[in-house]
Amino acid sequence: MRKLLFVIAVLFALAVTTNAQQVLTGTYRFDKKLADYTLDKNDGDRVVQMEVTFAKPFDIKPEVLVSVNYLDGDKNTNMRYELKTLSVSRDGFTVQVKTWGDTKIFAIGGGWMAVSGK
């Protein structure tokens, strides 16, 4: 009986470790304190980007989700923006915000989550 319990415990431990996921989270923020910030100036297409480096590299390339939880814009113009990730790798990714037309964004920020099966 002890051997059976030991074998079950070992198999369970192997199953848990082989199905484990790596998960990292963080935040990003763009505002006029950044040297190349242009989302609050002029009209037309404007883009800002930020490199994010993971605290610990993933074993395989993760899926990265980004969200907006802070947005400060001009109340007199339409609010248009596109948020996306670029160049996702095991070591990090680039978060990009784009706006167009007469939209003025004074600041935008949010969170990201990177998830990878081992």
Segments the model singles out, each with a brief description of its role:
Residues 3-5, 19-20:
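N-terminal prepro-regions of secreted/extracellular proteins
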Residues 4-14:
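Sec-dependent N-terminal signal peptides
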Residues 19-80, 85-118:
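Extracellular receptor-binding modules and their adjoining Ser/Thr/Gly/Asp/Asn-rich linkers
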